[in-house]
Design a protein with these regions (language model features):
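Non-catalytic substrate-recognition/targeting regions of SAM-dependent transferases
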Residues: 30-36, 41-43, 59-125, 133
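Conserved alpha-helix/loop element of class I SAM-dependent methyltransferases that forms part
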Residues: 126-142
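Solvent-exposed alpha-helices and their adjacent loops that cap or buttress functional pockets
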Residues: 21, 97, 136-138
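Conserved SAM/SAH cofactor-binding pocket of Class I
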Residues: 137-161
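Short histidine-centered catalytic/ligand-binding loop motif
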Residues: 1, 50-59
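Non-catalytic accessory regions of SAM-dependent methyltransferases
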Residues: 1-46
């Protein structure tokens, strides 16, 4: 088993028990240093995977990571974004059909439109899923001003609280 396949498989075994597939089809699979892949995140959007690199990686390393994902999950699509400081974001379709510009995902039974093509990420920060759920609980009967929003996901959760 390749080292990247081992890392991704370990990350998956740690997280799969926390995903409620009847209510959620998006989650962070690999979270950078915490999963022994420095400056790399891998997010799952239904059957589509987004790999984001925040430091330079050699192409052969990127290929090995994509191959490991494909061997473990057989995704419909793998998209890669390279987000280096001071440079434009580079988005590349690694394989599969291009994802439609307005792609709908579900998190905690709430639907969101995301885009793999716009901006640095998709606008839905998957590492904030639990915080959004907490806002939903804490905001019940209160008013909330969300001054720093991209997809307004925190506001949507607050409105449903």
């Amino acid at each position: 088993m390749s080292p990247y396949k081992r890392i991704i498989d370990k990350a998956w075994s740690l997280r799969k028990k926390y995903i409620n597939y009847t209510a959620t089809n998006v989650f962070r699979l690999v979270n950078s240093y915490g999963d022994a892949l420095p400056e790399v995140t891998i997010d799952v959007y239904d059957k589509n995977f987004l790999i984001q690199y925040f430091k330079p990686y050699e192409e052969h390393t990127k290929n090995k990571i994509s191959i490991a994902l494909n061997e473990i999950f057989k995704p419909e699509n793998i998209t890669q974004k390279t987000r280096l400081k001071g440079e434009d974001v580079e988005t590349r379709l690694i394989f599969g059909p291009e994802i439609p510009k307005d792609f709908v995902v579900v998190e905690n039974s709430i639907k969101f439109n995301i885009s793999f093509q716009d901006g640095g990420g998709t606008g839905l920060f998957l590492d904030q899923r639990d915080n959004r759920k907490k806002i939903q609980t804490l905001s019940k009967g209160k008013e909330l001003l969300n001054c720093f929003c991209y997809t307004s996901s925190f506001s949507v959760y607050a409105g449903l609280g």
